[in-house]
Amino acid sequence: MVRGEVFRLPPPKSARGHEQRGARYAVVVQADEFLGLSTLLVSPTSTSARAASFRPTVTLAGQQTRVLAEQTTVVDPERLGRSAGRLEAHELRAVDEALMLVLGL
């Protein structure tokens, strides 16, 4: 597992309000040196989310999808499904920029 790798993420059991529902992909955004922790920071994706400066578009499994930087969350690595590949370098840079925007860095 490395930063920028994409995994299938099963749906949460208790989503509320505007939290994402349904199975989707998740991009690992945690720094590689912290991947040994018991939890993992990921940003979920959506094919139906509206375009925004903090939602970079990436290609996953041949389909355009948006990374929801504003919904970055912590998951137990055991919740992740199989790896679906890795983001291209330019896509990961776009995710980094979105995270900086959302976090005010």
Give residue spans per PLM region.
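Conserved functional hotspots at enzyme active or ligand-binding sites that engage polyanionic ligands
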Residues: 1-105
